């Protein structure tokens, strides 16, 4: 664990960036990650049963998930790649704290609203974001930190639909997004508790 990681507060959840150097450089990265998130046929998590909710930010998401992916790829076609690092997708996972996950599991009507707000943060207002909330009930050898905990996968298009420039994702950006997500979760959970609605 790095010194930077030691200073992060995980009490309200943690953000894990899966886009390491050389990862997601394949042209089919976007549909593969989407398939994994949804447990689609042919994916490594085919027929997963722990998907609670999914959607997209910055793309039409009420018709078909394949249409979402087409929209991602259309934006990418407009970007001219100047370097050897041809990253086609960013994949990040926010793992809720155990307590927050329990509250959200007991109040599923809030999951849609919270996950959309979280995707808005991850998008920075210019990067299309597909997301899927998992209950954490299924064992996942690829992401052991998510086992037994509610979590949300973010598939972020690394090309801006506003500027067509690449997303700069590094430790500082991950830390910034993590803090924003933690603050959002704290606010939303506190409001839920104060409303007298949490079960």
Q: What feature does the model see in each segment?
A:
Residues 1-199:
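N-terminal nicking endonuclease/strand-transfer module with a His-rich metal-binding environment
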